[in-house]
Amino acid sequence: MSKVLVLKSSILAGYSQSNQLSDYFVEQWREKHSADEITVRDLAANPIPVLDGELVGALRPSDAPLTTRQQEALALSDELIAELKAHDVIVIAAPMYNFNISTQLKNYFDLVARAGVTFRYTENGPEGLVTGKKAIVITSRGGIHKDGPTDLVTPYLSTFLGFIGITDVKFVFAEGIAYGPEMAAKAQSDAKAAIDSIVAA
């Protein structure tokens, strides 16, 4: 039995293309892998606090007493990291906003990236500590950016996930959604076909 963690990060709730596709992924996965456990965390519905000058102090080793906000941030960071490490497959619904990921997803990454916990520095360079995972990124875009200089989502997510130890990453693209109903429908159809292929593998 595998454990699947689905991270939603769109601010558009049910209207969101990436949310719809991640819901489709869950439906297909449950159909093919009925014994698996699926956890869904909506980072827009339940937002992660923004990392600021106060909160960053909670995530670094120190003997200084923590404020209430810092204690809450550290507890949430511990919870998010434990959840991430406890799952085998990580599904990230990542819409493109202004060429990059949403603030909601970035805030999550800022609490998950902790030296000595999810990565460490060695004589040979940084080493990721979140290993043995597979990641599937479902990314929706209004325009067409794949393989172009305006796609900052793909290299950023590949780099971040690899940095914490997740190197088996597959991307599902839904592009051109803002080009009209016909293009949006094709983007959804193509993305669902890619999801079907991943689920069946």
Curated annotation (Swiss-Prot):
EC number: 1.6.5.-, 1.7.1.17
Alphabetized InterPro entries for the sequence: Flavodoxin_fold, Flavoprotein-like_sf, FMN-dep_NADH:Q_OxRdtase_AzoR1, NADH:quinone_OxRdtase_FMN_depd
Domain of life, per lineage: Bacteria
Record-linked Gene3D superfamilies: 3.40.50.360
Assigned keywords, A-Z: Flavoprotein, FMN, NAD, Oxidoreductase
Binding-site residues for FMN, renumbered to this chain: S10, S16, Q17, S18, M96, Y97, N98, F99, S140, R141, G142, G143
GO MF, one example: oxidoreductase activity, acting on NAD(P)H as acceptor
Annotated Pfam families: Flavodoxin_2
SUPFAM superfamilies membership: Flavoproteins
Disulphide-bridged cysteine pairs: none
Family: Belongs to the azoreductase type 1 family.
Known function: Quinone reductase that provides resistance to thiol-specific stress caused by electrophilic quinones. Also exhibits azoreductase activity. Catalyzes the reductive cleavage of the azo bond in aromatic azo compounds to the corresponding amines.
Subunit structure: Homodimer.
Name under which the protein is recorded: FMN-dependent NADH:quinone oxidoreductase
Species the sequence originates in: Escherichia coli O157:H7
